[in-house]
Amino acid sequence: MRAAGREKILSAPFDLIIFDCDGVLVDSEVISCRVHAELLTAHGYPISSDQVRRRFLGRSAWEAGREIEAELGRALPSDFDAQLKAAIFREFATTLEATPHMHETLAAIALPVCVASSGAPEKIRASLTRTRLHDRFAPHIFSATQVRNGKPAPDLFLFAAAQMGVPPARCLVIEDSVPGVTGARAAGMAVFGFHGGSHCRPGDEAALLAAGATANFDDMRELPAMIAQATDYTADIAST
C-alpha cells in the first residue's frame, strides 16, 4: 500500500481523529468478552463469549451489569465489577496486543488524535501502556465515566471534541461497534467502521454501515490513505 504523505493528511476535511480503544487501538475485545462470559456464568448467568460480544460490545460494563441484573431479578455481587476488572487485567498483562499495524498507522497520521472509550480510565491506561500506545495519546484520553451517558449516546464524543477544541463536524471517529458508530453520528461526526479485530464476525461490516458508518475498513494500514483521500463529509452529515 502506498503511504499517504503528511501534506495530504493535513489537507483532509478533519481537524481531529477520535479513536475508540477496545477493538480499535488494541485487540482486546475477544479477551474481554471471554472473561466477562466466564465470570457471569460463574455467578449464575450462563452466557457465551459470542453472546457477550453481540449484546454488550461498545457499551460499558456498568450498563451491561444493570441489564443483566434486571433479567436475573437480583443483584450481582457488590464486587462483581472489581472481580471483572481484576480478571481482565490479569489476562491483558500477558496476552493483550495492539491491533496489527497500529503503531505504523499512527506514525503516518499528523492530525491531532485522542481516545474516547467506554472503558474505565484505569482499564484504558493499562491497555494502552501494555501495548506502548499510551504516550501517543496522553493526556488526551477520555472515558465514558466522564460523561452522563455512554455510547450509543453522543455525550462522550462531544466531550472529547470540546476538550480538544474542535467542532464536531471537523472530527472523524474510528469505531468497531454499532453503539459507537451510532453515538458518533448522533454527535454530528463522520465515522469509519473498523471490522478487522479478532472479535469481528461476518455481518459486522453491514451492521456498521447500517448504523451510519461513513466508510468501513479491516486493515489499519488503509486508514492514513482513507483520511487523506476523504471528501468533505460534513455536507453528508448535515443532510442526514
Predicted features along the sequence, with ranges:
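Residues at secondary-structure transition points
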Residues: D27-V30, V52, F56-R59, A75, ...
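Hydrophobic alpha-helical core bundles mediating ligand binding, dimerization, or RNAP-core interactions
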Residues: S32, H36, L40, A61, ...
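A short, Lys/Arg-enriched amphipathic alpha-helix followed by its capping loop at the start of a domain
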Residues: L39-H43, H101-L111
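Helix-loop "lid/cap" segments that line or gate small-molecule binding pockets
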Residues: L39-L40, S60-A75, S127, A161, ...
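Short helix-capping segments at alpha-helix termini
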Residues: A42-P46, L72-A75, R132-R136, G165-V166
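Metal-dependent phosphoesterase signature
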Residues: R66-E104
